Amino acid sequence: LAPMDRSSDPLFDYVGGYDYCLAQLQNMASQSQHNVGDVSSAAYTVPATLAELALAYEASPSTRLVAGSTDLALDITHGLKSIDRLIDITGVAELQCIEQRDHQIHIGAGVSLSAVEAFCQQPLPIMSDLLGRFASRQVRNRATLVGNIANSSPIADMPPLLLVLDAQLILQRGSKQRILALKEFNLGYK
């Protein structure tokens, strides 16, 4: 293979490469007809405890709960969703836990896919292997397993394995908790 001739490609003009790229991006942005969803006026809450989370959600049950926000961010940037209120659960320490108890793996709603991948290497290598193939490392560092389930996408990667494993969800609203089999969680198309 012959080396690529970069002399006529302004992207590889190392003297002005950065300026060229920046100018191109600014030009694309100014000509864009892309309708980006507006979240500038959204109320944003970051509770520190489960009790604070319960109070914030009880005050506004239509609020969107978020952790990684990877799918939500796509919907917003594509203008598909408008968000009025967000509760970010990443500040709730109780939801950042992952542990093995009684031959079960308990994964909090705020645990990233990368953390699940690392944790499951010994107790559940098939899950670790699957997560290693899931999206990019950047997405796995932000996205959560619970978000992948809650998003209810028909093309979500994790639910098939979780269904085979008879996964269960611990759902909580206020002080009330219940356990629900994953197979009973999604009742229809997203």
Task: Describe these PLM feature segments.
Residues L1-K190:
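C-terminal structural segment of proteins
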